[in-house]
Amino acid sequence: MKYKLVLAVAVLVFSLPSQAERIKDIANVQGVRSNQLIGYGLVVGLPGTGEKTSYTEQTFMTMLKNFGINLPDNVKPKIKNVAVVAVHADMPAFIKPGQDLDVTVSSLGEAKSLRGGTLLQTFLKGVDGNVYAIAQGSLVVSGFSADGLDGSKVIQNTPTVGRIPNGAIVERSVATPFSTGDYLTFNLRRSDFSTAQRMADAINELLGPDMARPLDATSVQVSAPRDVSQRVSFLATLENLDVIPAEESAKVIVNSRTGTIVVGQNVRLLPAAITHGGMTVTIAEATQVSQPNALANGQTTVTSNSTITATESDRRMFMFNPGTTLDELVRAVNLVGAAPSDVLAILEALKVAGALHGELIII
């Protein structure tokens, strides 16, 4: 019996947005961001799925000392229901002391599962070393594991990672530049000089000339009210302002592992002929000129007609209608049974030859 392996290359052609987008959907306010917190703690109450590492014992002994319990030096606690964990959380901007945070708890040692455990009081610190929140509570673990006497094991999802909804209480807030200075700055999520200029123009059209100025391809600086109480309504108005983002530059994105190829709308091909192994791909382009009657009130138009063929040693040929695009080239190569690596090699050769007008990105 013969088995045939079919390698499929997924080709996606994306059209870049031409409709208006709200500023809040394409940009962030500089300085208004979340902050990462991390801590080191103990999970107790595990049903024999804990660990016996030296640092687990050391952490457990330190906790006992903090409670005023001192064990003799020659006594080592036998613990199977304890695990050392890393605790982390994201602290949103403007969150105030007393509010809650969701936390994620991950095992650091040899614990088999955190299911059924409880995190003891853990300090969550920022990069500056200050404590911003305190976490504690029962874990919610979606995964599980089970071991058989014969050495067999079943693991579902990840039993060594859990979450505690509202498991941390904020003790200190983080200052932001929102209420200080004479300016507010918007940072585009995708840098583009044209989009930055369009954003500044839209803001100036609403507020008046010279109220906004693009600093570079990412940042647009806006003069803000000096009265802090007016900045919320001021920013609420601006972030709902519509801006038409500029079209992205021509790009071809290739994932060599999965065979996925994403072709940008503005990618262009010049006439070229490619031979790759036993496969031949040919691109031809013809120009047609439409000249209106001399007495007609018309304009001369120039159109391009392209034809692409792909052949293998078995003489298979594929013909395409005029107006060749890169996705048609990729489909033609895929139809003759080319592997994703062959498609990638052809795209790289087209780029080097100057026949592919666009940025080739390999991920």
UniProtKB/Swiss-Prot annotation:
Coiled coil: none annotated. GO terms for cellular component: bacterial-type flagellum basal body, distal rod, P ring; outer membrane-bounded periplasmic space. Its main location: periplasm. The keyword Signal applies. It is found in: Periplasm; Bacterial flagellum basal body. Keywords: Bacterial flagellum, Periplasm, Signal. One of its GO terms (biological process) is bacterial-type flagellum-dependent cell motility. Residues 1-20 form the signal peptide. Pfam families: FlgI. InterPro entries: Flag_FlgI. GO terms for molecular function: structural molecule activity. Assembles around the rod to form the L-ring and probably protects the motor/basal body from shearing forces during rotation. Belongs to the FlgI family. NCBIfam families: PRK05303.1. The basal body constitutes a major portion of the flagellar organelle and consists of four rings (L,P,S, and M) mounted on a central rod. This is Flagellar P-ring protein. It comes from Shewanella baltica (strain OS185).
